[in-house]
């Protein structure tokens, strides 16, 4: 009886909030003030070797990628184009490269960190698909990119068909170290070439207790977002197989109500998505189904900022002939439907280009605020699943936000660091939790005392 009472008391104390975070508990990353952005000169960071044949995206039998998909319809692009088509914007696609063609004619060469090409090649098909979502040209069918008047900058930063010639140590950490170094250089290069929207749809995931040095990456991200005023959009990550080239990530626990001071549950993170976790400089994008619900594979995390369509996508093939595609070949060369946060990020980057074109006076932080403030909110507060809510292109282009009395058309303001949200006043909730904890402890102690008293009164057997 006494043991049961104290066991109940111990459980009550844990539930009441006396919780010790794991040794690897993390928080939002902090940019090292002493770190310098790396050189953005393209070129392989390590000698690479092609290990597999190139993949070409195609059309799944019995389907027509020219028919507007539910994902495209969800954004109501014809209505959005009444206000902006992305004129005057340069969007960098840091991915597997982009193959120009009739549906992607406005692509600038941004260089290659895999081989020594100009970046206008795509051995995986992924980068071209993302580019088509951002700025693919309309044709005699129902497909169009979000911002068809924008220009694209192709920077080839990775390929699943290539790997380092030599590797040593832990292969996961070695690959992650290489990926982080390449991404840092690619982001600096994109910013230096004038991209005002930078899309990163290839991500790296690591366990929270097995991280690699990201000082240079943090400096590069801050340099692009603050010094160069670029909106950086990144895929949140996928927790299962999908039509994407990024490796599968592990999921994260959602909000823990026992820790009211950590509403986004940074302390509970077990898997980190790079570069998405670099808050507040990166807008991380989760995936939605065609019905507007969170995709099952979309990786949750405290960095998720917004959600966009990411399932059963259609876009432009890397075949080079302007054909559309809705599938990528799997390991058995069977075409698999295109789904992933990679493509969701492309939709957000496209809308960011529309907003920057319509409101040239907004800096990068204000553009991100406009995207998140006009999203369809699934909850009153940002969640680890969909962030601020579902992307709304028309609202982002038309709503007048309280802080923008002039509709955002004022002259550009000096760019400052994105503000870190002020700590929420959780005093009332903390008091409630403390009161509940104290009451629970009192009840537990009373139960234990009563049990001891009864034990003393009972005859000894």
UniProtKB/Swiss-Prot annotation:
GO CC terms: extracellular region; peptidoglycan-based cell wall; plasma membrane
Q: What residues form the membrane-spanning segments?
A: 432-452
Q: Which residues form the Peptidase S8 domain?
A: 64-397
Q: Which domain of life is it from?
A: Bacteria
Q: What class of enzyme is it?
A: hydrolase
The record's active-site residues are 95, 126, 342
Membrane topology summary: Single-pass membrane protein
Q: Where is the signal peptide?
A: 1-25
The catalytic activity of this protein is classed by the Enzyme Commission as 3.4.21.-
Where does this one sit in the cell?
Answer: Cell membrane
The recorded induction information for this protein reads:
Constitutively expressed during growth in culture.
Q: Mind listing the UniProt keywords for this protein, alphabetically?
A: Cell membrane, Hydrolase, Membrane, Protease, Serine protease, Signal, Transmembrane, Transmembrane helix
Q: Which InterPro entries match?
A: Peptidase_S8/S53_dom (IPR000209), Peptidase_S8/S53_dom_sf (IPR036852), Peptidase_S8_His-AS (IPR022398), Peptidase_S8_subtilisin-rel (IPR015500), T7SS_pept_S8A_mycosin (IPR023834)
Q: Name one GO molecular function term.
A: serine-type endopeptidase activity
Its primary localisation, in coarse terms, equals: membrane
GO BP terms: namely: protein processing
Q: Which family does it belong to?
A: Belongs to the peptidase S8 family.
Query: Which NCBIfam families does the record match to this protein?
Result: T7SS_mycosin
Name of the protein in question: Mycosin-3
- Species name: Mycobacterium tuberculosis (strain ATCC 25618 / H37Rv)
- What would be the name of the gene that encodes this protein? mycP3
